[in-house]
Design a protein with these regions (language model features):
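Short, Lys/Arg-rich, polar N-terminal cytosolic tail immediately upstream
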Residues: 1-11
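Membrane-interface helix/loop boundary segments of multi-pass membrane proteins
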Residues: 10, 127-152, 181-188
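Alpha-helical transmembrane segments in multi-pass membrane proteins
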Residues: 10-61, 81
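Hydrophobic alpha-helical transmembrane segments
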Residues: 14-22, 78-83, 114-118, 147-152, ...
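Aromatic-anchored segments of alpha-helical transmembrane domains
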Residues: 24-33, 87-95, 154-162, 198-207
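Functionally important transmembrane alpha-helices
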Residues: 30-33, 168-212
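Structural signal for the C-terminal ends of transmembrane alpha-helices
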Residues: 30-33, 57-65, 94-98, 182-185
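Juxtamembrane helix-loop-helix connectors linking adjacent transmembrane helices
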Residues: 35-44, 64-127, 142
Length: 212
């Protein structure tokens, strides 16, 4: 389906981009309104953010999922970025996650068990990262080029953090751009997922007082 154009009123539209934008807009809305599919929010998000985009690629676009970042990619680049970013963010978050706003927000939401917290955070973010740093990023890169794609996918990602502590929300545009850059450099959504999983888990563990 890549490159298929439809013309309406003399205006050309890329059909694949239309579908990607619809999915990238409607799925977060359905998630926001709390449509309960499994009884667990993280499992619901696997369906919304991972399974639906994946089925779209395979059944509708009829393209290899690797073309949308679902692969190991350039693992050397990915591993280096993952290690460096996680170390730097650990130092920053050690202090930021102790602020009253972060503690108030995450103490009420963090699971009691450390293992449960890490597990459910990983499940929750797996599909989330695939939608932005896989499905949307690589589709947009074809249509608009990688630079624009990296910026564009970061916008909805940042807006969906509204309601979280202000400091965290204000940094997410830059975080989303960084994640997109790493995904493009490594040609994989896996490394942004690993980084995001670490950042989210570490933040909750510090803010809720479960470690340090």
């Amino acid at each position: 389906m890549s490159g298929k154009i439809i013309t309406i009123g003399g205006v050309e539209f890329d059909l694949q981009i239309i579908i990607v934008i619809i999915i990238g807009t409607v799925i977060p809305m359905l998630d926001w309104y709390g449509h309960n599919l499994t009884g667990t929010k993280a499992y619901d998000r696997i369906i919304w953010y991972f399974i639906i985009p994946m089925l779209t690629i395979v059944l509708l676009f009829r393209e290899p999922v690797a073309d949308f970042g679902f692969q190991i990619g350039n693992w050397r680049v990915g591993v280096v970025w993952t290690a460096v970013v996680c170390v730097v963010m650990a130092v920053i978050l050690y202090f930021v996650a102790r602020t009253p706003a972060m503690q108030s927000y995450y103490q009420a939401r963090a699971p009691e068990s450390v293992i449960r917290l890490i597990y459910i955070t990983g499940v929750d973010l797996f599909g989330w990262e695939f939608l932005w740093r896989g499905f949307m990023l690589f589709a947009f890169a074809r249509a608009f080029g990688p630079g624009a794609a990296i910026l564009l996918q970061a916008v909805p990602f940042a807006l969906l953090h509204l309601g979280k502590p202000e400091t965290e929300t204000l940094t997410t545009l830059f975080g989303g751009v960084g994640f997109g850059f790493i995904a493009w450099q490594s040609q994989s959504f896996v490394y942004p997922f690993l980084i995001h999983w670490f950042i989210a888990s570490f933040t909750m563990l510090i803010a809720s007082g479960k470690i340090f």
